[in-house]
A protein has these predicted regions:
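Glycine-rich FAD pyrophosphate-binding loop
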Residues: 51-71
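Rossmann-like flavin
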Residues: 115-237
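N-terminal Rossmann-like FAD-binding beta1-loop-alpha1 element of flavoenzymes
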Residues: 31-57
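C-terminal catalytic lobe of FAD-dependent flavoproteins
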Residues: 321, 364-439
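Extreme N-terminal leader/targeting segments of oxidoreductases
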Residues: 1-33, 51-52
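A conserved beta-strand/loop element that lines the FAD pocket in flavoprotein oxidoreductases
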Residues: 240-252
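Active-site substrate-recognition segment that forms the wall
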Residues: 72-75, 80, 84-123, 252-262, ...
Length: 439
């Protein structure tokens, strides 16, 4: 996943599988596959293809992890991996969404594709559709951390750290109750979540970086986190060490299926492969559209920076009302947040950085929010229904892997494992049924 997000496209169509049995012909001839995009999803797909004996080349328009994989919070939290469209998003209202200091921001624009995406997104902000999406996530959430363990056992030299503790913090009782209600709904959909409730004092004892503005917290069990740049660098090195070429700073201009192979066009010429995986994040529709991928993929941009802290917490801290995520990164604290629906290539908006600073300041003690390093914006690929876009397209040799929204890091390795199975065997795993690119 070059960046785990995608650009916009026309309205959704009903999902039609390549066949009723969810099978596609495996690539003919040899086993040479191109993966377009070198973020978490793309690199994990490459690694699992190699695990199955496939020769892989990765093509990246910038550098490894240059997109939404690099600066995100690095949370491996199946407990929180849910469809993005829900009723709480609509509570912000249009006036709040047009405010650049709001956690969810939509700049005033005449871009029709953005408004089509937002209309589709709003239609999915219902309890019924959220539950249907949650059921789709349930099976992949159960396996997500196992895929990281497989990468580690296979030589990816970067740790996943236990999130001990992982604290979801609140200033008001009603905020806590909203989270408890959501966790209850997740469990009603069949996904178990381990947690306990802390007082504000207990939360501050567990994480002294918190101020007394935190009156209560939910401590999630059995979650993890990573340092994204370090992890992605190790994953790329593991892919290279198995013989793959990762070609950076190379833009794919087009993809064509000639009936026998797939032709990938770059500025340096055409290259032939037995199959291609499009894992370009928020730019996925540009290459996927000719192969029937009509699902709008919109950049949901997130911001982050790192700051020094007198007492770096042992695990992540989440402020859900403020949409602020804090992750320990060595001696510094990465602070990330916001959701901004606009073009994936737009420059960083400093108002959004300041909005994070102002929202986080009342809750964090001993943190120098003015000493910011690594200020970053990345484009998360969001879909109207909040589900990824993973599987075969109208071509049996072209596959899509993207649209994970905020969950490209936690679901990237499992996506790679499942999609590698589909490419090699020609059979789409049951876990990917709801995520079909032709839905």
């Amino acid at each position: 996943m070059l960046d785990d997000d995608e650009r916009h496209t026309p309205a959704q169509q009903d999902f039609r599988c390549p066949s009723e049995e969810m099978t596609v012909p495996p690539p003919r001839g040899g086993r040479r596959v191109a993966v377009v995009g070198a973020g978490m999803v793309g690199l994990a797909t490459a690694w699992f293809l190699q695990q199955r004996g496939v020769e892989v080349e990765v093509i990246e328009r910038r550098e490894v992890a240059a997109g939404s994989s690099w600066g995100n919070a690095g949370w491996l939290t199946p407990a929180l991996t849910t469809p993005l469209p829900d009723r709480s998003v609509l509570r912000y209202g249009m006036r709040a969404a047009l405010d650049p200091t709001s956690p969810v921001y939509v700049p005033i624009t005449l871009e029709a594709s953005l408004w089509r995406f937002l209309a589709g997104f709003a239609r999915h902000c219902t309890t019924r559709r959220w539950r249907r999406g949650m059921v789709a996530y349930r099976s992949v959430n159960r396996q997500a951390l196992d895929a990281f363990d497989e990468l580690g056992a296979g030589g990816v030299d970067a740790p996943t750290r236990p999130a001990d503790p992982f604290l979801v913090c609140f200033a008001r009782d009603r905020e806590k109750q909203a989270m408890l209600d959501e966790l209850g709904e997740i469990e009603q959909c069949g996904q178990k979540v381990g947690f306990d409730v802390l007082t504000g004092s207990e939360a501050r004892t567990s994480a002294p970086v918190l101020t007394d503005r935190v009156t209560s917290a939910v401590r999630l069990h059995d979650q993890r986190f990573i340092d994204p740049p370090r992890y992605l660098a190790a994953l790329a090195e593991a892919v290279r060490s198995r013989g793959a070429v990762i070609t950076e700073n190379s833009t794919v201009l087009g993809i064509r299926d000639d009936g026998r192979q797939v032709v990938v066009r770059t500025r340096k010429g055409d290259h032939r492969y037995d199959a291609v995986v499009i894992a370009t994040g928020a730019w996925l529709p540009e290459l996927g559209h000719p192969f029937g991928v009509r699902i709008p993929v919109q950049a949901g941009r997130g911001y982050s920076f790192t700051v020094p802290a007198d007492r770096v917490p042992e695990g992540p801290i989440y402020l859900p009302t403020q949409r602020i995520a804090c992750t320990p990164m060595g001696r510094r604290l990465r602070i990330a947040g916001m959701m901004e629906f606009r073009g994936p290539d737009e420059p960083l908006d400093r108002r959004r950085v300041h909005a994070i600073v102002n929202a986080a300041r009342p809750f964090l003690d001993g943190v120098d929010l003015e000493d910011r390093h690594d200020e970053w914006v990345g484009s998360r690929p969001c879909t109207p229904d909040g589900l990824p876009v993973v599987g075969p397209t109208t071509s049996p040799r072209v596959f899509a892997a993207g649209g994970h929204g905020m969950w490209g890091i936690v679901l990237g390795p499992l996506t790679g494992r499942l999609l590698a199975d589909a490419v090699v065997t020609g059979t789409v795993p049951d876990e990917l049924r709801a995520f079909g690119p032709l839905r």
